[in-house]
Amino acid sequence: MDPTLISLGALALAGAAATVSGCAEDLESDVGSQSNPNSQVQLGPQMGNIHRYFNKAISGEPVSYGLYVAVAGTIAWALINAGLNAVLAIIVGSGVAAIVHGAYSVSAFLGRIVGQSKKFGQPVYMDVLTSHIGPIVGHGFIAVFTMTLAAYLATTALGNPFPLPLVALIFGITVGAIGSSTGDVHYGAEREYQKYPFGGGIPVANQGDIDIYAEYGVRNGLDSSYFCSRFGGPLTGLCFGLIIFLDGWRSILGNIVGGDLVTKTSIALLVGLLVVAVAAVINRKLEVYARNKYGPYRN
């Protein structure tokens, strides 16, 4: 079979895996209130808002997912070199990473909540721990598995020269950064502040004054993930999937059109710059259109 067709198929699969990975990663962080929105959850009891959110801020998402995917990639790489089937090796590595993820989540939740119990009266709800840890580990496993699969395809079918553990680390950092900057805005700036007028941002005076009641009953992290699965999660997945797909596409296009290594590299760089320029123009047009249509925010 034509090597170019194999590369295109692998790239399509890697892009699809990255899309699923980004969505699962963002929804996992919504269940556990990690990264940007976590500072608001952490401030809630200090503002008198006793909540039932899962508060786990182990670290920023780029660092934590860099760790999880690197663990999965390292174990998978070792098992593959030992002769195990690649898919099984990735599953085993992702399972170990999920256990690490769960251990950090439990210790972070108990540590942060207990630290606020005496001074601010925030109880440790054990049912929140038991009901949220499953979705956290489950979404985390899906995210880590698909990221490790994309990293494996990059190192085998797409010609990435770096070893699987390093590529997995980079992919984990990347998807964590995208989830933190793209999907978490839907949770931290909207879901947690639905009692305030939409579009006003989060003034300093309102920080920590989070919503603690849902449409029915008291709100928790599972409600947040359900809400964000409609927009924030898919948007994160689309962003990460496009990054993986377009980055691989420019390299394949350089291999198709170019002859020697310098020509291939130059074409790939030019295509990458063109993609960035087109994305910047589209973003600008979209922002101007939205501002002209809806106007400035007024309280």
UniProtKB/Swiss-Prot annotation:
It is found in: Cell membrane. The keyword Isomerase does not apply. Keywords: Cell membrane, Membrane, Methanogenesis, Methyltransferase, One-carbon metabolism, Transferase, Translocase, Transmembrane, Transmembrane helix. GO terms for molecular function: tetrahydromethanopterin S-methyltransferase activity. One of its GO terms (biological process) is one-carbon metabolic process. The chain crosses the membrane at residues 57-77, 80-100, 133-153, 158-178, 226-246, 262-282. Its main location: membrane. It is a multi-pass membrane protein. InterPro entries: MeTrfase_E. The keyword Membrane applies. It catalyses: 5-methyl-5,6,7,8-tetrahydromethanopterin + coenzyme M + 2 Na(+)(in) = 5,6,7,8-tetrahydromethanopterin + methyl-coenzyme M + 2 Na(+)(out). Pathway: One-carbon metabolism; methanogenesis from CO(2); methyl-coenzyme M from 5,10-methylene-5,6,7,8-tetrahydromethanopterin: step 2/2. It is an enzyme of class 7 (translocase). One of its GO terms (cellular component) is cytoplasm. Its EC number is 7.2.1.4. It comes from the Archaea. Pfam families: MtrE (PF04206). Part of a complex that catalyzes the formation of methyl-coenzyme M and tetrahydromethanopterin from coenzyme M and methyl-tetrahydromethanopterin. This is an energy-conserving, sodium-ion translocating step. Belongs to the MtrE family. The complex is composed of 8 subunits; MtrA, MtrB, MtrC, MtrD, MtrE, MtrF, MtrG and MtrH. This is Tetrahydromethanopterin S-methyltransferase subunit E. The gene is mtrE.
